[in-house]
């Protein structure tokens, strides 16, 4: 996957995490035609890669040295969550954290301001499964899928609640 990504022309900025069933994982960031990659495996000292909506790899930060306050806060929330759970994280703990509303967690409901959680996924590459929750709300339930089974073609009614964000979360803050 990494070799294919390195040759792929990407015309927008993204943070992408790719992983496989052998315990290899990479954070791939693109920014204005540039690409940076950080890879880990089961033998690496670092055992987690994560990103929000700003560059986190040192090679790209000079090209985008500021980020929205909400992106930095969510990144810091992930860092703190991982620090609190050094001995291991269950899927249930991860799901609860993902659905915790911002600013304490990651879930955002500011849809009219173009900033809302549309879906939350927990993937298990070893088992070949994923759990999905629409709208970042526990009321919508988690739906489990196995990669070896056909994905159902279906629609579902979900509940979302639009809120208005404090404008300060859209301010830019320096990353350096």
Which positions does each model-derived feature cover?
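C-terminal, well-structured catalytic/ligand-binding subdomain of enzymes
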Residues: 2-176
């Amino acid at each position: 996957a990494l070799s294919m990504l390195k040759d792929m022309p990407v015309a927008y900025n993204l943070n992408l995490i790719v992983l496989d069933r052998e315990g290899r994982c990479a954070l791939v960031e693109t920014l204005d035609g540039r690409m940076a990659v950080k890879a880990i495996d089961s033998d690496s000292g670092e055992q987690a890669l994560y990103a929000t909506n700003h560059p986190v790899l040192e090679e790209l930060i000079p090209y985008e040295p500021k980020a929205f306050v909400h992106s930095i806060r969510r990144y810091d929330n992930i860092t703190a969550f991982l620090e609190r759970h050094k001995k291991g994280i269950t899927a249930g703990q991860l799901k609860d954290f993902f659905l915790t509303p911002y600013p304490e967690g990651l879930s955002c409901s500011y849809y009219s301001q173009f900033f809302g959680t549309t879906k939350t996924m927990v993937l298990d590459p070893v088992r070949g499964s994923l759990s999905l929750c629409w709208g970042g709300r526990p009321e919508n339930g988690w739906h489990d899928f196995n990669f070896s089974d056909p994905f159902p073609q279906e629609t579902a009614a979900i509940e979302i609640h639009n809120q208005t964000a404090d404008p300060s979360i859209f301010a830019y803050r320096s990353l350096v």
